[in-house]
Amino acid sequence: MNAQTPIRRPISLVLASPRGFCAGVDRAIQIVERAVEKFGAPVYVRHEIVHNRHVVDRLKALGAVFIEELEEAPDDRPVVFSAHGVPKSVPAEAKARQMIYLDATCPLVSKVHVEAQKHYDAGREIVLIGHAGHPEVIGTMGQLPEGAVTLIEDLKDAAAWEPKDAANVAFLTQTTLSVDDTADMVALLRERFPGIAAPHKEDICYATTNRQDAVKHLAEQSELILVVGSKNSSNSVRLKEVGLKAGARDAHLIDDASGIDWTWFDGISRVGLTAGASAPEDLVQGVIDAISARFDTTVEELVEARETITFKLPRLLTA
């Protein structure tokens, strides 16, 4: 061995599966790509289509123009609504302006919208468990008249909620929160209102649950966990928190391989790697390559679940 060649320390890299894109994110990105193909550039997109900088930058390069509000888009160009969902007023405005619009709302989020309307039509008072200001929460609350949905962010909110008719209430949850995330609040609501109407089990986002369950098992056999995802991605932030709570010594959220601080690896022999639902697999591969370039790396996969779900594209793009 050449005297100048450093000794490469061994590292075991455990990949969580599933990780990265879920069916809703995959569909939303395809909608923007297909819209640019069909209608040419520019195609306007209201809000980040998904919360990932790399995805947004790539779509910008294809001809997508990201805007905050519909008023920023001209009447004669197509507009796409993000995967997080939008208030009812947004498609209503697009219709009034006779715009071509494509709704990339995740079908699981759309299910929550349908449930909200059903509860409202049945005269129930509704609480939504979620994070204030998150686009999905804004979209869900915007399905109904102002004041029809009360947002609950923590146990304090759940304890303080006083409906007019305690026997006629319902709760909904933000899809990027798992069963674990909401368990304490749901338990308190059920204790206070035994007859509260709850979401169907199949309406809970499979991707959020699967990715968090995978990270829990990853934490059992990793000293350090790296989560590939953007800081404004709710589900990515939660993956890091779940990893720490499940016993990982350290966990970090990184945009890509350039976000790695190599001092994190000091004294570490087993590293877990996962990605949020809006993070592309090529960024995960970039992290694997960066670690493999520095260490004698063995890669193994920890399979929590196999995901086969796909969602159909809007008819306008497939006709």
From Swiss-Prot:
NCBIfam families assigned: ispH_lytB, PRK01045.1-2, PRK01045.1-4
GO molecular function, one term: metal ion binding
Record's protein name: 4-hydroxy-3-methylbut-2-enyl diphosphate reductase
InterPro entries in the record: LytB/IspH
UniProt binding sites for (2E)-4-hydroxy-3-methylbut-2-enyl diphosphate: 51, 84, 134, 175, 233-235, 278
Active-site residues, as the UniProt record annotates them: 136
Entry keywords, A to Z: 4Fe-4S, Iron, Iron-sulfur, Isoprene biosynthesis, Metal-binding, Oxidoreductase
Example of a GO biological process term: terpenoid biosynthetic process
Enzyme class: oxidoreductase
Binding site for dimethylallyl diphosphate: 51, 84, 134, 233-235, 278
Catalysis performed (reactions): isopentenyl diphosphate + 2 oxidized [2Fe-2S]-[ferredoxin] + H2O = (2E)-4-hydroxy-3-methylbut-2-enyl diphosphate + 2 reduced [2Fe-2S]-[ferredoxin] + 2 H(+); dimethylallyl diphosphate + 2 oxidized [2Fe-2S]-[ferredoxin] + H2O = (2E)-4-hydroxy-3-methylbut-2-enyl diphosphate + 2 reduced [2Fe-2S]-[ferredoxin] + 2 H(+)
Cofactor: [4Fe-4S] cluster
EC number, as in UniProt: 1.17.7.4
Stored CDD domains: lytB_ispH (cd13944)
